[in-house]
Amino acid sequence: MDGFKTSQLAVLLLKEALYTSQKGLLKMVLKTLTIGGSDTWGGGGIQTDLRTFENLNTFGLTVLTCIAVEEGDNFAIRALSVELVKEQLQTIEKNFQLDGVKIGLLATVEIVEVVIDFCRRHQGDFPIILDPVLAFKETQEQLAAEYIEKMKTLFPLVDLITPNRNEAQLLANSEPVETLEAMVDVTKKLADQIKVKMIVTGGGLIATDLYRDGMETRAFAGPLSEKKTNHGAGCSFSSAICSHLAQDFSLFESIDKSKKYVFEAIENGVIVGDAGNVWHPITQKSCGIKSSDK
């Protein structure tokens, strides 16, 4: 009996040692949070954010704001309650010291207000990247003017916004952007209006992305993939920037690395159902390890 009790004690001590070791490891890894929606089809949203975080060597955490579901021949966004979003954020704040935050689809004005309060509490604590999801390629719908105006209140609280050309057009109240020249114009117009660092992406039509911070404009050129597996590219781009910034890469390094990462994810994309989703096999995650690049 004494031997049995001794064995039990040894097992308990081993479990405690493993638990303590795991807790210590969790404290050491970089922790990045995505605040956004769930894409039931798996191509965008928090699903792609978490895959990107893992591929680029950060530990992903989530605050869910909404769920995309099929509705007839289209899709619908089902928002979570404001209280549930608040409770998730409180859980994160209580238990984790974050190294970066990526914000995606917020779904309602009320949820935007909750996220504004969160960003005010943590402005300057860690990089905050905002992908302002204002237009959906699948339906060409535009979100309400009230939502767009509320999002503009969020912009000064983040470190970078990553609109695609269509979202930049909506934010700047501009004409449709179909050429690089028009993209340059809308980027300058938007930067003059909202005074925040931004990288405007070509959105599958233009291979060049444009950075502007009010003082400087910089072009990030690259090849244009002919693959149709680009669903989730915008989500992956912003979460990749978040991961790289969390690893202390400079902003321009982070943008450049993330652009290359997303191109590979499109090239390696997969067809799932009727969707062509970005995909980045986990075996390629070494492209985000800082020590191998410097």
Label every PLM stretch briefly.
Residues L18-K27:
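Short, Lys/Arg-enriched N-terminal segments with co-localized hydrophobic residues
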Residues L9:
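Cationic, low-complexity basic patches in intrinsically disordered or flexible, solvent-exposed regions
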Residues G36-W41, F220-H231:
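Short pre-catalytic strand/loop immediately N-terminal to key active-site residues, enriched for Gly-Thr
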Residues A79, E253-K294:
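Charged C-terminal helix
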Residues V29-T34, T48-L130, L134-K137, T283-K290:
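Conserved N-terminal subdomain of the carbohydrate kinase-like
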Residues E141-T217, F252:
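Conserved phosphate/ATP/ADP-binding segment of small-molecule kinases
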